[in-house]
A protein has these predicted regions:
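Sec-dependent signal peptide recognition
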Residues: 2-9
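N-terminal signal peptide c-region/cleavage motif recognized by signal peptidases
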Residues: 13-19
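Short N-terminal segments immediately surrounding and downstream of signal-peptide cleavage
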Residues: 20-44
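Structural recognition of the beta-strand scaffold that forms the well-ordered cores
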Residues: 23-25, 48-51, 74-77, 102-103, ...
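Short acidic active-site motifs
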Residues: 31-35, 58-59, 110
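Primarily the HKD phosphodiesterase
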Residues: 38-99
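Solvent-exposed loop/turn segments at secondary-structure junctions
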Residues: 53-57, 79-83, 107-110, 121-122, ...
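Signature of lipid phosphatidyltransferase scaffolds
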Residues: 117, 121-172
Length: 172
């Protein structure tokens, strides 16, 4: 009940007469994962995603589905956090579907969890793109819909990490 109230209150942050709004979600209650999926599935022309740990089959499927419908999907991930079997398998699926993936090892960790959608919407928060974030961890997601000025700032940050990254080579 508290989660529904918080999501409702966050949705009230709408600009009168406009489409700009902010929505929040939480896990493990389930609203974080739903919000991430809705945001990714809303993309029409671009998804620029950056993450720390990456193992979520649902996110992999959403990104591949977006790519197949013509969305330009690019992903930049922390190098050290994605050496396990589940991460390697998830990233290989993306690359084998034609999605560009780069990994970054310039910082101690690249702890960003961000998706920039169509250069106007930003999804961010503590939520890693993992099953643990969905099912076990206490996490949060914030989506800022139709906020191109905010999206531009995040896109510049995303681009700085993308330019530091090394292209992922599929291991199968």
């Amino acid at each position: 009940m508290k989660i529904r109230i918080m999501v409702f209150l966050a949705s009230l942050l709408c600009t009168i007469g406009g489409h700009t709004h902010v929505i929040v979600g939480f896990s493990p209650e389930g609203s974080a994962q739903k919000l991430v999926m809705n945001t990714l599935n809303s993309a029409h022309h671009a998804i620029n995603l950056m993450g720390y740990s990456f193992t979520s089959p649902e996110v992999v499927k959403a990104l591949i589905t977006a790519k197949r419908r013509g969305v330009d999907v690019r992903v930049v991930l922390d190098s050290k956090a994605n050496q396990g079997r589940a991460s390697v398998a998830a990233i290989n699926l993306l690359v084998n579907a034609g999605i560009e993936v780069r990994t970054v090892d310039k910082n101690k960790i690249m702890h960003d969890k961000v998706a920039i959608i169509d250069d106007v919407t930003v999804q961010t928060g503590s939520f890693n793109y993992t099953r643990a974030a969905q099912r076990s961890n206490s996490e949060n997601v914030v989506v800022m819909w139709q906020m191109p000025e905010v999206a531009q700032v995040y896109l510049e940050h995303w681009q700085s990490r993308w330019s530091q990254g090394q292209a992922w080579q599929s291991r199968y």
